[in-house]
Structures are given as structure tokens and as C-alpha cells.
């Protein structure tokens, strides 16, 4: 990870209460509406005044590569659930009521939860409460955006407070009303941890003057948009000032981002170049958004972080900041960026993903690094050289070919139309095709819940009844903190080649490179920069064993490859604990899931004979 400063490690901040207990940090997530990366002066934008946001960036961290969805509802669904839209997007203006949100999870951890601003995720009167929010002050909850031809969000807004309609008729300004409600919520809950989620109304069109505009009758859309961005900044400043007033500032993580790019009607200047807004587009103009994180005495100051951030990353980050475990029964695509902003050991993501479907149109998808971007159509762009994506690359360098292969592997993970290949090793939802190593039924220590195979207590290794030699095995895994497990293949008894499953950060074996996650255990080390997700999150894995060739894959990237008859193999084999085993690595045998005395989870185990 590249940073433009020297990091001084700081202790993880928290407030000590009079009782001696530790109060979990408060969490504020602010998401403006239609305000791209170029709209913040700290990012190099010069068209707008954003002093409060700039101060948060100066005294905290800002990211240069945060990517949203191209439109509001898709981004709201993704940020609240931590999942790609490919998994759970239903339609515009709707959040599937079966989904779990960060509000649900934080509420279970004792947080008071509040949402203010724009809803647009379902018109059921109980929607905010259903999705985990104790309190709400919202526009476009059960009512339409317009009433008798007039917009209802800005002057004299039509809102709903905790499900009750409230119309204002004395010149009140919608953004002021909802911001004041959030500030009041913080004051009422200052003695307990709270989550304040503020998907803003501003600066979405119609572009109208704000209470601070010089000309209250202005019809100049560009000027009015500029004033609306300034009012976004003012609302952020009001919230931060309230935290200061309450003495909560040092125990509150404040995050600011935006739901998508700027409106196409707006041109802005960024680093001396004019940028046309691109809301609804899959380009940077539609998806490159600001991200600022601030937490005094916990986040080092003046950080400029070039790591990638996906909108699915906010949920695990909030849970991480709350020191709360991620649920084991959810599929999450995000990973916490808290280590980056707090100056701790981090494992930056290698790519981000966007899935976008408008109405009944066919969905579009891409995966990207900071520089390169691959669409599901096969078009591959160097975004540094071609920001508007006019000229897809045709002739690739070896390095570009490698990046493209990684991005294709990532895309394949989210292809809803891709048929699962191979035989499901738990097709019956039980252990009928598995035994213990000594041939007994699997009766203790292992269980299956909602398709997840969970090693939860001592039960011993388990193996398939069928033996395999040449195959492709795909599976997902996650491990407990400081945990160890593995998937063995070409086995005899408990011996065999092993795809290592490990908490690389906390396990005592983490000083041995060939014992780290994804490695061919005790033989071939996975690279340090492998795309491993943190403890508690699902990693996708693949093992290919065909003849003498052995490959290990992790989250779409090949991390181990070796030929059993090669000089490299002979060298590492002689240094391993297996050196006395004749024909080791060439046996035909069962697939083995290891019981290494730690909780471990596996799912979607599918094998295809080669």
C-alpha cells in the first residue's frame, strides 16, 4: 500500500466509562447523493468549497480509489448489506426484506441505530425498523418524491419521522431538518454506542438554491449545484461540531462517501482538468467517489491511501470498528479497511467489482484494479491512459495478461448465469458421502447448517468415500481467529498434499511461509501479496491436480503452481516432513477436511474429475 506520509502507530481508541467498562466507538456514516470524487477540494477538486470535509481529510485519512455503483439504489443495497448486487439486487427502489444490514448486526451488539435522509428502499411503513434502525427521519420513505408537481425534499419538505408523516410549511429546509434529527439522536444516546447512518438528500437534482445561496431565486443549475455541495459540507460540519459539543469526538469514527458519480449535467475541475459527471455510467465518472475517514487519536493524520475500496467493504469495516465479529452465516463480499486507516497491518484487496442492472436490461459487470478494468464483454482498459474507456486494449504485455487473468477469475465469481461444474460433495446436505479417516460415520465435531460445513468441536478429520487423483476441486473456506485447518488431497490415511487454511495474522505458525494460507503445506509457499480475506470472511479456493501438475488458487488468483517431477519439487520435498514417503503427491485417495482443533467453515465443495 502506497502512502504519502509516515505512519505513527496509535493505540486503538476507546472511551473509558466511570464504571470502568469500555464504551464501544460511535459510528457515523454519511453518504452524499450524486457527488463524485472531483467534488471534494481535498481530492484536487477546485470547483467547490468543502472546508469541513477537507479538515476531516487533513486530520484523518482519504482514499483515492473508492468505487460505488453507478446509481443510488444499487449503492444503498451494497453498502448496507456488504454484498455484491450480483447476489441480492432486486430492483430500483427496493431492498429485499430477507437481507441483513449493518444496522441489524450493530443493534445486536448494543448499538442505538438511526437513519436520516433519503430512504428509497421500500415503501412498507416499517421498512427502516425492519432493517435494524431504531429511529428514522426520512424523505421518500412511503411517499413519492413529488406532490402536486412540486419536489418535496428541499424547501418545506414532506418527511416521515419514525413512520409518521410530517409536512413542513414554514420555509424549513429538508437537509437541515434531517441533520438536526441526527444531532438530537446523538445527544439522546450519548451514554451508549450509536450508529448514525445518513444517506443525504443533497446534492441530487433538482438543482435549487440553498438557504445560503446569494440569489434565492437562481435558476443557474451549475451555480446552484455548487451551493448544494457547499451545504453538504456545512451539514458534515454541523454533525462534527455536535460530536465535539457532546465530548464524543475522540470515540467516534466518521466516514464520508457518495452513492455514485456526479450528474451528467455538471462539469467540474479536478487537478486542472475538466470532468463531466457520469451518474448511471460504469466509467470512473459514474463510480469513482470520495471516501474520508476521521477518528481523532485513532486514525493517523494526513493519510492519502491508494488502496482499493469496494462499497461492500463498509459493513465489515463498521463491525471491525465496533470490535464485533462478522456473522458466520452470511455471504459477505467486503473486507474491512479499518487496518489501513488505523495504521495497522493490512491486506489490501486486489480488485473491486461492479454489477449493474437497469430495469429489464441485461446486467453489466466489471472488475478492476487501480489501473486496469475488465468488463464481462471481454473489453479491457487501461484507465490511467483512457479514463473515458474509448480504446480497449488488444495487444497486451505479459504483465497486462497476468492482471487480465486475475480480473477474469474475479468476474467468474459473480457470474449468476455460470453453471456450477462438478459434483457437489455434500449434495444430500449431510455426511452420507463422508466418513472419518478410520471409516466410521461422521457423528460428532462436524455439522452442516444452511449448506455450511462447520468443524465446531473435536471430531477428527473427515474424508470422502470416493478416491480421486486428477481433479479440479472448488470450495470456499473461512477460519476462526488464530485458527488452523486444511484441505488434503491425494491422501493415504491422514497424509496428503494440503491446501493450508490458516489465520495468517494470529496463528503461531505464521512465521513459516509454507504454512501460511493457500500454501501447499510444508512444500510451496503462497506469495505474501496473495488476495487473502481477513478472518471471518469467505475465501474462494480451487485446487487443480492433473498428472504431475498441482495448482492452488485463491479468490480468483493462482497462488501456487508446481510440477511434481520438477527440480523445484525435489528440492522442497527433501526439505519437508514428507521426504520419507514414497510416491507422496502421486497417490490416489480421498479428499480430507482437517480437524486441527480450531473452528473452521467450508461450503460449496464441488469436484470435477479430469
Residue ranges and their predicted role:
Residues 7-15:
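Bacterial N-terminal signal peptides
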Amino acid at each position: 500500500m502506497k502512502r504519502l506520509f509516515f505512519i505513527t502507530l496509535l493505540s486503538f481508541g476507546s472511551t473509558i466509562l466511570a464504571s470502568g467498562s469500555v464504551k464501544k466507538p460511535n459510528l457515523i456514516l454519511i453518504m452524499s447523493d450524486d457527488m463524485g470524487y472531483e467534488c471534494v477540494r481535498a481530492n484536487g477538486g477546485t470547483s467547490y468549497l468543502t472546508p469541513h470535509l477537507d479538515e476531516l481529510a487533513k486530520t484523518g485519512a482519504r482514499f483515492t480509489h473508492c468505487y460505488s455503483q453507478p446509481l443510488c439504489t444499487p449503492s444503498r443495497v451494497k453498502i448496507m448489506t456488504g454484498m455484491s448486487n450480483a447476489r441480492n439486487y432486486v430492483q430500483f427502489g427496493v431492498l429485499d426484506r430477507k437481507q441483513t444490514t449493518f444496522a441489524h448486526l450493530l443493534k445486536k451488539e448494543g448499538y442505538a441505530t438511526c437513519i436520516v435522509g433519503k430512504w428509497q428502499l421500500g415503501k412498507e411503513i416499517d421498512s427502516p425498523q425492519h432493517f435494524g434502525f431504531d429511529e428514522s427521519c426520512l424523505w421518500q420513505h412511503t411517499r413519492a418524491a413529488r406532490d402536486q408537481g412540486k419536489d418535496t425534499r428541499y424547501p418545506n419538505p414532506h418527511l416521515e419521522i419514525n413512520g409518521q408523516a410530517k409536512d413542513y410549511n414554514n420555509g424549513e429546509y429538508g437537509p437541515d431538518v434531517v441533520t438536526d434529527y441526527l444531532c438530537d439522536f446523538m445527544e439522546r444516546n450519548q451514554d451508549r454506542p450509536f450508529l448514525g447512518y445518513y444517506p443525504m438528500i443533497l446534492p441530487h437534482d433538482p438543482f435549487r438554491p440553498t438557504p445560503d445561496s446569494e440569489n434565492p431565486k437562481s435558476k443557474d443549475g451549475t451555480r446552484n449545484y455548487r451551493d448544494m455541495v457547499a451545504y453538504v459540507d456545512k451539514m458534515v460540519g454541523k454533525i462534527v461540531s455536535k460530536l465535539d459539543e457532546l465530548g464524543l469526538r475522540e470515540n467516534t469514527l466518521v466516514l464520508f462517501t457518495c452513492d455514485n458519480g456526479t450528474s451528467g449535467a455538471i462539469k467540474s475541475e479536478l487537478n486542472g482538468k475538466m470532468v463531466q459527471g457520469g451518474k448511471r455510467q460504469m466509467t470512473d465518472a459514474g463510480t469513482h467517489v470520495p471516501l474520508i475517514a476521521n477518528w481523532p487519536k485513532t486514525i493517523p493524520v494526513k493519510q492519502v491511501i491508494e488502496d482499493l475500496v469496494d462499497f461492500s467493504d463498509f459493513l465489515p469495516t463498521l463491525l471491525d470498528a465496533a470490535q464485533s465479529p462478522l456473522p458466520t452465516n452470511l455471504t459477505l463480499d467486503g473486507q474491512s479497511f479499518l487496518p489501513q486507516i488505523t495504521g495497522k497491518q493490512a491486506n489490501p484487496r486486489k480488485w473491486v467489482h461492479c454489477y449493474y442492472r437497469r430495469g429489464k436490461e441485461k446486467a453489466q459487470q466489471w472488475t478492476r484494479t487501480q489501473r486496469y478494468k475488465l468488463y464481462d464483454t471481454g473489453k479491457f482498459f487501461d484507465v490511467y491512459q483512457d479514463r473515458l474507456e474509448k480504446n480497449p486494449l488488444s495487444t497486451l504485455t505479459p504483465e497486462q495478461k497476468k492482471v487480465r487473468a486475475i480480473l477474469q477469475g474475479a468476474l467468474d465469481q459473480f457470474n449468476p448465469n455460470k453453471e456450477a461444474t462438478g459434483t457437489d460433495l455434500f449434495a444430500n446436505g449431510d455426511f452420507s458421502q463422508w466418513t472419518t479417516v478410520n471409516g466410521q460415520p461422521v457423528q460428532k465435531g462436524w455439522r452442516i447448517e444452511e449448506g455450511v460445513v462447520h468443524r465446531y468441536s473435536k471430531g477428527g478429520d473427515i474424508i470422502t468415500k470416493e478416491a480421486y487423483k486428477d481433479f479440479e476441486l472448488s470450495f470456499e473456506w473461512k477460519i476462526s481467529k488464530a485458527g488452523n485447518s486444511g484441505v488434503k488431497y491425494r491422501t493415504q490415511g491422514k497424509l496428503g498434499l494440503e491446501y493450508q487454511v490458516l489465520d495468517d495474522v494470529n496463528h503461531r505458525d505464521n512465521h513459516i511461509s509454507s504454512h501460511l494460507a493457500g500454501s501447499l503445506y510444508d512444500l510451496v509457499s503462497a506469495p505474501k501479496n496473495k488476495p487473502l480475506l481477513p478472518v471471518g470472511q469467505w475465501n474462494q479456493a480451487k485446487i487443480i491436480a492433473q498428472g504431475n501438475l498441482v495448482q492452488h488458487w485463491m479468490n480468483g488468483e493462482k497462488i501456487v503452481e508446481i510440477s511434481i517431477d520438477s527440480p523445484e519439487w525435489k528440492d522442497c520435498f527433501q526439505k519437508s516432513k514428507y521426504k520419507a514417503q514414497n510416491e507422496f503427491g502421486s497417490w490416489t485417495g480421498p479428499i480430507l477436511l482437517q480437524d486441527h482443533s480450531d473452528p473452521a467453515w467450508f461450503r460449496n465443495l464441488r469436484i470435477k474429475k479430469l
